[in-house]
Amino acid sequence: MDFIKGLWRDLRARPVDTLVRWQEQRFLWLLMAIAMGGLIILAHSFFQIYLYMAPCEQCVYIRYAMFVMVIGGVIAAINPKNIVLKLIGCIAAFYGSIMGIKFSIKLNGIHHAVHNADPDSLFGVQGCSTDPTFPFNLPLAEWAPEWFKPTGDCGYDAPIVPDGVTLSSVQQWFVDLYQQSEGWYLLPPWHFMNMAQACMLAFGLCLILLLVMSGAWALKLARGK
């Protein structure tokens, strides 16, 4: 508690210098890499493999954006005081968060369209492909199909358990929970915050933090001149 109070006291007293000092430490960069890497592992290992929620085209694009941020965080964490490494990390983090927001917004629009009672809501909505085209034409679906090959339909993320599969009691509980809510929600019984919205929140928070940190760094460099 005293540690947190100390951080808050430093931030209030010298905000720019404190923010610059924070980004010159490995903690924040590793935190970003671990957080985004953890979300990728959670989506793949728990929801896709354990609960049989097949990823759609936009889902694997979101994973790509998170993976870029993981790489950026790791590169910057090698030596955050090195301007080149930190700049590479910042560019990768900004790119990943912006692209992630873009993919999440598109998936959210598709989700609302397919779950809308009005059939006209689907008019003009582009469907999902099982043959993704990643930025820079990266063949991620060929390199790591388990992680980046879409096998589901956009907007439909309820568990689909293959015939003949025997579920454990824990699996059955989660599968029933998400099937009854007709998809993934942060709070399934109340349909609160679908997967696309949760991803938007994660990317948005990262983007805000990056903007604040980069702004402080730019001010520090400007003052140094």
From Swiss-Prot:
Q: Which SUPFAM superfamilies match?
A: DsbB-like
The record's subcellular location field reads: Cell inner membrane
| GO annotation, cellular component aspect | plasma membrane
Topology with respect to the bilayer: Multi-pass membrane protein
- What are the protein's GO molecular function terms? protein-disulfide reductase activity
Chief place of localization:
membrane
Keyword Cell inner membrane in annotation? yes
KW Acyltransferase (keyword) present: no
Q: Name one Pfam family in it.
A: DsbB
- Judging by the UniProt lineage, the source's domain of life is Bacteria
Q: Where is the signal peptide?
A: none
Q: Any idea which UniProt keywords this protein has?
A: Cell inner membrane, Cell membrane, Disulfide bond, Electron transport, Membrane, Oxidoreductase, Redox-active center, Transmembrane, Transmembrane helix, Transport
| TM segment ranges | 27-47, 65-85, 87-107, 199-219
Q: List the disulfide bonds in this chain.
A: C56-C59, C128-C154
Its GO biological process annotations read:
protein folding
What this chain does, per the entry, is described as:
Required for disulfide bond formation in some proteins. Part of a redox system composed of DsbI and DsbL that mediates formation of an essential disulfide bond in AssT.
The family database entries (HAMAP family) matched by this protein are listed as: DsbI
Similarity comment text for this entry:
Belongs to the DsbB family. DsbI subfamily.
Summarize the subunit comment. Interacts with DsbL.
Instruction: Identify this protein by name.
Output: Protein-disulfide oxidoreductase DsbI
Query: What's the encoding gene here?
Result: dsbI
